[in-house]
Amino acid sequence: MNSFRFTKMHGLGNSYIYVNQFEEHLPEELLSDLAVKVSSVYTGIGSDGMILICPSDRAPVKMRIFNSDGSEGKNCGNGLRCVAKYAYEHKLVEETSFLIETLSGLVKAQVEVDEGKVVSATVDMGEPRLLKSDMPMRGEQGSETINEKMIFGGREMKGTAVSMGNPHIVFYLDDIEKAPLTTMGPLIEKDERFPEGVNVEFVEVENENELHFRVWERGSGITQACGTGACAAAVSSVLNGYSKRDTDITVHLAGGDLIINWKNDGRVMMTGPAETVCEGEFFIS
């Protein structure tokens, strides 16, 4: 294989290179290295990683996500919306509501269509998991981490841990523009308390229905948006008394807005845009 076709898509600036494995059949042994190569802004296409849209025995399509460092992730909210858009527009599915298989399980997606094009997608992100063992996170495995004091690099911080199929730790501050992403993000991501690493979110509460959000993503660093992170931020804000259940919460990310609702039945719904940037052919060197 000397080349493959790709589609670059983004959800609020969180961009990935999407590959249709129904047609391309990239070999397993190349996936990690290819993710690193295509993600490079210097020698590749430029993205936060690579997402494969694959056949599935359990759903119409399966999503596999590889971060820009080559590691494989379990879930990606922005990626799910883009996969939903791609699957519908490329006729991999016929209905506007369908399932997507991920490493975290089956996810239900609903697309909003205008003149044959998907303009937004709502994804059922499932139920948040709050125990340390769910993250995983070192400590008392049967306990939750809500507004818990922690020390990172000599700095005391209060964090809330939420798993949305991948691990998140949420911190609150008064001014989102002062979020210490470059200093604290990589330090916390690789802290020994999180044996598999962690996504790091900083949140400023505007009011009970609006949050300002910045993220350091595990395996990718600073990104414009993180769908599972926005879900974790909304769940954390309910747990800490800033927001309410069964209410639309607008999360303002660097790349735009997502609507998150932690329903009374326990499931978290995420609504937002998905856009195609370009299509092309990538040559493997």
UniProtKB/Swiss-Prot annotation:
GO terms for cellular component: cytosol. Its EC number is 5.1.1.7. It is found in: Cytoplasm. The active site is at 76 (proton donor), 226 (proton acceptor). One of its GO terms (biological process) is lysine biosynthetic process via diaminopimelate. This is Diaminopimelate epimerase. The keyword Metal-binding does not apply. Pfam families: DAP_epimerase (PF01678). The record marks 168, 217 as: Could be important to modulate the pK values of the two catalytic cysteine residues. One of its GO terms (molecular function) is diaminopimelate epimerase activity. Homodimer. Substrate binds at residues 14, 67, 77-78, 166, 199, 217-218, 227-228. It comes from the Bacteria.
